[in-house]
Amino acid sequence: MLELHNVTIGQQIHSLSMALSDGQLVNITGSKGSGKTTLLRALLGFIPIDGGHISIDGELLTPMSAPYFRRQMAYVPQYLTLPEGYHEVSSDYLQLLRKAVDSGKTLLIVDEPPKELTEEDMQAVDDMLMEAVQRGAMVVTVNSRFMQNQVSL
């Protein structure tokens, strides 16, 4: 279980609490600059929180424990920095998401899909996210098109 209890991060996020169990998806929504990606970075242990706590399966996420927890997570960023020769944003993003879903990790953290994705690509994203949920993974995503189980910032 992923739990956030009264999490505060900078000026963007104040006293956010939520819980996510195995086989559940939560979609983070909000306007530009509202802290969506900041929250994902805190869940990954990349940035510290200013208040409250985050726990995974009852264990607190701290700067010391973050590397351990990241081994249980798969992260798909919004924008990819790819080697020269990779030109198709959509297929690269879909390949990275497929790898994350197939990794068997217990927690998938998926930032907003690139704007370049087609309607068909977005359906593939939705299908892969639901596949991960059905497998029992916890999925935290930022996706303005995926309307199930939203948390607005």
Indicate where each model-derived feature is located.
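Conserved catalytic loops of ABC-family nucleotide-binding domains
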Residues: 128-146
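Short loop immediately C-terminal to the Walker-B catalytic DE motif
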Residues: 114-117
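Conserved beta-strand
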Residues: 4-7, 11-24, 52
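Conserved catalytic motifs of ABC-family nucleotide-binding domains
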Residues: 75, 80-88
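ABC nucleotide-binding domain signature
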Residues: 27, 67-78
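Conserved ABC transporter NBD signature motif
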Residues: 52-60, 69
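Helix-to-loop junction immediately C-terminal to a conserved catalytic motif
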Residues: 44
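The feature captures the beta-strand-to-loop junction immediately N-terminal to the Walker
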Residues: 29-31
